[in-house]
Each structure stands twice: as C-alpha cells, then as structure tokens.
Amino acid sequence: PASFVPGRNALFLSTAASYAYNRDVQDLVGGMCQTDYSGYPDCRRVFIDSMETSISLAMDMDVRIHTPLMYLTKAETWKLAKDLGEVAGQDVFETVRIESHTDYNGNRSQWNEWGYGKLDNPASKLRAEGYKEAKEKGWI
C-alpha cells in the first residue's frame, strides 16, 4: 500500500531498545508475524533475528526480541486474544478489538466487528479475514 513505511519495524525496535537500555530491560516484545510478509519484509523472523543481533552488538548487551504472534495466522491471533481472558482486569480480546489498529490508511472512523478500519488496504483485509475465520471456527 502507498502508506507502507519500509523498515518501520527497524525503527520501532531500535527506539524500544534505546528506551529499554536505560531501564536495564533486555527483553523486547513485538507483534510482528510472518502472515504479514506479503509486501512487508520487516515482519519476517530472519529480519527480527538480524535486529536482535544488531541491537545486542550496538548496545553491548544480550537483547532478546520475542514475537509471540510470528507463526500464528490472523485467526489464531484472535483465538489467542480470546483464550487469554482477562489480564489486569482488562478483557484482552475486547482490548485488542477496540484499541489495536491495523488500517494502513489510518482510518479510525469506520467501526467493524473486527475493529476500526476500511477494507481498502491489505492489513485491514487480513485482520477482517482472520476475524471471520476465527468466528466461523467458533474460537471467538
């Protein structure tokens, strides 16, 4: 899509690592997944591994980048959110559905049962299709 920012996850991970360094935190968590790879090379595991190595070398400490969604389909990600139930008094599924944002065109005005966005970009289409599949399988 036109709004795709090449290498954005390199920027996010570098920024997070700099912030974490000053707090003596060595574990970073990212929501990247290879299901997003079609057109998004910075969502691949090989990229994340290279960033883990580069950040560790740049900061002279062992940094670990955890990507719990890496090998899940979008439907499985919705299922995971549902299965997590409540955390710290918050319904994880509802928090993901309402507060997370996937639309690459920044649309937050159109509400759908899968969250905010329009189906005019690949990211929203993947999210909506995953939601539909999870619903059809009775996971959510």
Language-model-derived ranges and their functions:
Residues 1-140:
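Nucleotide-activated chemistry modules centered on ATP-dependent adenylation/adenylyltransferase
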